[in-house]
Amino acid sequence: MLKGKHIILGITGGIAAYKSVILLRLLIKAGAEVQIVITPNGKEFITPVTLSALSGRPVISEFFTANTGEWHSHVDLGLWADAMVIAPATASTIGKMANGVADNMLVTTYLSAKAPVFIAPAMDLDMMAHPSTARNINLLRSYGNHIIEPAAGELASHLVGKGRMEEPEQILKVLDEYFEKSASLAGRKVLVTAGPTYEKIDPVRFIGNY
């Protein structure tokens, strides 16, 4: 169901960024067109050169291209996308998204996106368990975003608990199932009522609800 879909893959500054390369390859193999948007800290974990080579597109990180002054429109990106996936999503980026802190290209694009947004949190055990993180994730969920819950296991800190970014194969499955469900509803006609309805049987009888 991903063939021909336009996917924004947002990458933030966490050790799980290496999994984003695997996810990128899976998306392309499934036939999707992928545009990478990476935060400045994300580039400390994985190079734009690698991502550009795999995606076949220039990686976007800043609002302007330094050597040409070319403007990258977050509005155009938001309109282009069929879905936006942020994997990994660090506590910092989650907080910015939840509270509208548009200080980088990724969060600005998120705030402009018209497409469904899928967020895969990844962080250490204590950060994941912190009340502020839980609040921000719940806020994002209340906005209509899809939260791909992190898995439990050994973390980069060698602690064991919840905080591992979900595996790329599972994220791909979530996206595939979303588009499959959307396709099954395409073209359907739905009647929405506000109040009781009546279906006439004969001149004196009807079936109704209230």
Regions inferred by a protein language model and the residue ranges of each:
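A cross-family phosphate/adenosyl-ligand binding-site feature
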Residues: 1-210
